[in-house]
Amino acid sequence: VWGGDWNQALEGTDYVGTRAGRAAITDLLEASRLSLPTRSLGSATPGHRSIDHIAVPMTWDVLAAWRIPAEVRGRRLSDHDAYVVSIKD
């Protein structure tokens, strides 16, 4: 499992990364046989894709991936949200 703040959206418009960075990460994921269930998830900024990701082995059965807003009573705790991937065990 490889996860964290990659500073790179991997689909849609990329507001912080680069095309070269996106290509390098995509190539590495393929070479490492990792899938990216968080690829299509949004971020704390409406209309933006996540730059935080969780990659898992392609052989894992991913049930779902979702974003948990990092806020309490409308107050942001971080500029990044939390991301979760559920797998079948």
Predicted features along the sequence, with ranges:
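Active-site flanking residues adjacent to catalytic metal/cofactor-binding acidic residues
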Residues: 3-5
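Metal-dependent phosphoester-hydrolase catalytic domains
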Residues: 8-89
